[in-house]
Amino acid sequence: MEQFVHSAWSMIPFGLMLLTIAVAPLIAEHWWESNRHKLTVALFLGVPTAICLIVGGMLHDLEHQIFGDYIPFIILLLALYVITGGIHLSGDIKAKPWVNTTFLALGWVLASIMGTTGAAMLLIRPVLTTNQQREHKVHTVLFFIALCANCGGLLTPLGDPPLFMLFLRGAEFTWFASMWAPWLLTGGLLLAIYFALDTYYYNKEHWTAISADHREHTPLRIYGKLNFLYLVGVVLTVAFVNAGVIPQMGEEHAPMWIKYLREIILVSLTLLSFYTTKKKVRFELNKFSWAPIVEVAVLFFGIFTTMTPALAYLNANAASLGLDATWQFYYSTGLLSSFLDNTPTAVAFHSVAAGLTPDQMAAFGGNLVAGVPEVLLQAICLGAVFFGAMTYIGNGPNFMVKAIAEESGIKMPSFFGYMFRFSLIVLLPVYILVQLIFL
């Protein structure tokens, strides 16, 4: 048993967990819809792994993974999910190219503040309503996925789950803002491409569609404004309630309420949001459901448990894996983030970077951030966040946006259609340019 947890074989449950998440929705969609079935898979792979870890002398590693990573991770996602689920933006304005581009730019900026899921869910319905009279609108949803559900969430650990995990591993809250240049270049290029493309399609619209769009006009209106205050509370809590600011939170024998002070505050903000937001806003206008966050909690229990021995193996054998260039970390993280979940992918490559020898680390120069060379951490962050937009399964909000668009009557591209008609020809060249300039 001890030999298993310290060998490459220990990575099999982790690989099977990620493979199931990636493949099951494609080959057994109806069966996979049930959270009970997801829980079955998580327990089937997670419980035996946990037993092996305990017997193999890695109980401390398992405890750290569950109590130090999993619980804070899920509580943050719960807070963002509930609070943003209490904000509703409605209205129908003219779907001119500059209006659509403004919507996408707003979501791109908000993604770093309220998370990619929050920004996407806040804006996707107003975008679809605004464009309902237009015939050509698939491209708007595709760029929405790229900008609002992925690329925008780079500047804070709230933006995308992999960034929060790297924050828990020692990267400072403000460090993520240092990636503003690739964030700005990527967003600026995608917005410029979108504006040109939307202008082209707008000029191709039949005059009846344009006329209908001009006639049907409803001013924008925001419901649940109090939740913006709770959202500010989340940002301040993550930024200032941590061991870096309050050293007692990191002490081994500190009281539980001190260790989990951040989580206690986040849960309090979550409850305030839930009980002070009108049910009509949350459940009728936003069609709020607990199912998505339950799904995340269930799947990530399996991911975090099976990931424990895999991370230990990668860290111990990092020097022999042959990753010795920044671009290799960028594209390796990006490739796996495209088809697997980007959070465990980012954590795995952080473990690889942390396991490099001192001489290997010195070759990258610069400061160490979260225990790894800064340029490698940037490569991992950029690869995880940006490449999540390469497929529908690269990041959680992608499928949610696709489903809402299809409910509105938009015929979205297939899994491979999305890649060959959009991500490979539009996104990948931009990502390559980012690597050439910054990495």
Predicted regions and their residues:
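Intrinsically disordered, low-complexity non-transmembrane regions of multi-pass membrane transporters
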Residues: 1-20, 45-49, 198-231, 273-291, ...
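Alpha-helical transmembrane segments
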Residues: 65-77, 175-193, 253-268, 332-338, ...
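Transmembrane helical segments that form the transport core of multi-pass membrane transport proteins
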Residues: 231-356
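Membrane-interfacial helix-loop connectors
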Residues: 111, 122-135, 140-142, 165-181, ...
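Juxtamembrane and boundary regions of transmembrane helices in multi-pass small-molecule transporters
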Residues: 31, 155-156, 165, 174-222, ...
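Interfacial loop-to-helix junctions that mark the boundaries of transmembrane helices
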Residues: 1-10, 31-40, 60-72, 173-183, ...
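Hydrophobic mid-bilayer segments of alpha-helices in multi-pass membrane transport proteins
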Residues: 10-21, 35-51, 70-80, 105, ...
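Transmembrane alpha-helix boundary signature
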Residues: 49-69, 81-96, 109-122, 308-317, ...
